Amino acid sequence: MNYKPTSALTAARFATLLGCGVLSASSAFALTPQPLQATASYHNDLSRPLREMAAADTPSRRQDREAAENPKIPNSHVDTPDQLVDRGSLLRFLAPSLPAPILNFDGIPFPGVGCNCAPPDTNGEVGATQYVQMVNEGYQVFDKATGNSILGPSSITSLWSGFGGVCQTSGFGDPVVLYDQLANRWVISQFAGAGSIPTDECVAVSTSSDATGTYNRYGFHLGTNFFDYPHLAVWPDGYYMSMNVFNSSGTAYLGPQPFAFDRTAMLAGAPAIFISPVAPLGGSIPPFLPADLDGSTLPPSGAPNTFLGFPSSNKYTVYHFHVDFTVPGNSTFTTFATPAAGGFTSLCPTTRSCVPQLGVTSSSKLDGIGDRLMFRLAYRNFGDHESLVGNFTVSAGGVAGIRWFELRGVTAGPLTVFQESTYQPDTTWRWMGSAAMDGQGNLALGFSASSGSIHPQIRYAGRLATDPINTLAQGEAHLFDGAGSQSATGNRWGDYSSLTVDPTDDTTFWYTNEYYPTTTTFNWRTRIGSFKLGTGTPTPTPTPTPTPTPTPTPAPDYSLSISPSSVSVGRNGGSAVYTVTVNPTNGFSSLVTLSVAGLPAGTTPVFSPNPTMATSTLTLTVDSSTRKGTYVFTVTGMGGSPTITRTTTATLVKTNGR
């Protein structure tokens, strides 16, 4: 395809970064030093307006085509007890307060636009006046004020009409649509290939905020491997993408690979390059996602894009991708931090036959996709702090639950796990999540829900910024309840869904996912809905109201406290000692098990005793390699029946460190 590597960044440069202290040896353990490459698009042009193009069909494909893609990632996770399950100890006191959907309408139905395939890979994005939904090989544009269709459904090949090559003739699916609100442009992508595997990425950037208008189109050849599961993100200096890479036969996982596309050039319709490692990062590296910018407040000036890895080793591996499209040799992809993640149990690590449904046999259980972070990884800068929110699926209480999280300080540090929790309030299986945060700091989570007694449903849950951390305290609502279950189709579901935030008011969430209207095979439908968690100033959480009784007796409870509030250690490390106290109320007399999260790499915690009914000494042994910084960590206590979870925070300061 006549693509040109224009520069290479050597392993020696990576070693220099280590020697200069830009990276510590402990933080870089996950990466094998590799050169980077700059590769030019092999073709670019300007399309005709989409509204003038025919809704071109692609040749019908075998129904197992998409089901054969998206190989599972080898499981390297060691299961540990999940201490973060929120089964509703707080929620049971609160009336569900999530509002009903504002708009709620059907999207593209099976068979899409010429693609007899499953799953649909449903995703969508909201812009200034429109909502664009994509499924495998199809797109549709809606009026966001009414939900009425403006254009489509149309084949994605219509977008590439006249471009030539595999982008026009051999799209493989895995589409993604984003809205670049900094430029008021749409970004649409899918992968393609001349043979049986995807080897190219096709990216189109609109020339205006009208998704039915013209597009700057680009074809990029990535290599000869099997490049799978592309997910894009918007950042001020580039469009960033993650890929899961396999050998050409799809039988061996070679690791993830990050890509950065020249946003400035693509907005202008000029020839563009991407910068990437010359090869995937290795089969021992879990998949990752790039941070996707929400809101109009930019990241700190010059901040790198953040990639976050799936915490298969109970650590959130945070990478920084610095790119320089003018001098590509200045670009680096490095590990920034590896904060601890709460323990969890993998969901169905060796099989796709996992999530039960009503009315079908066990052979038709659905794929839970518990081996990666789910789309999107949403970044927002609030001025006084940065937030990065996401989710993945775990096994909790014998069903699928959703581990959601918020990291802070992801570009400049100090990086902390501000909150994380497993949402599993009952015996329903919840998976296929997508998380985002609005401009008020309210967090929403959209997902699929199913069990042996219900057909798959589309639901959402949320929390206000003022709610207790680690809880989705606003409860749960139903966007749409399917009336059927899926049989056959290789157990596939998803492979992803999409929750986005309206750029005009920064408070309205838009969510899209799939469902089935009847129990059958290859008959999916998609749904699109919008909702809010708050407007203006976030609404305070409702005050718990106990059930009236003739002689009310407060329930046993406790709180946690820690002293001192801050301890410092010097450049050589040492021990930081705190006292954690269980403060019982109303006759609480149970043992409380303590855990800690948010500590920097190189820090080992020990509680003595643990569990405790009174006090426990927390000793943090800080290694000399721990980076200089101020780290806010969270101590969590779990005790009582039913389990009561309480938290407290303190600070560890490493001075004159590396």
Question: Where are the language model's segments positioned?
Answer:
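Long beta-sheet-rich domains in secretory-pathway and surface-associated proteins
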Residues: 538-658
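Sec/Tat signal peptide C-region and signal peptidase I cleavage site
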Residues: 26-30
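Residue-identity detector for glycine
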Residues: 19-21, 536, 657
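Short linear Ser/Thr-Pro motifs
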Residues: 22-24, 206-208, 616
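N-terminal secretory signal peptides that target proteins for export/translocation
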Residues: 1-11
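C-terminal PAP-associated
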Residues: 31-536
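Bacterial N-terminal signal peptides
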Residues: 13-25
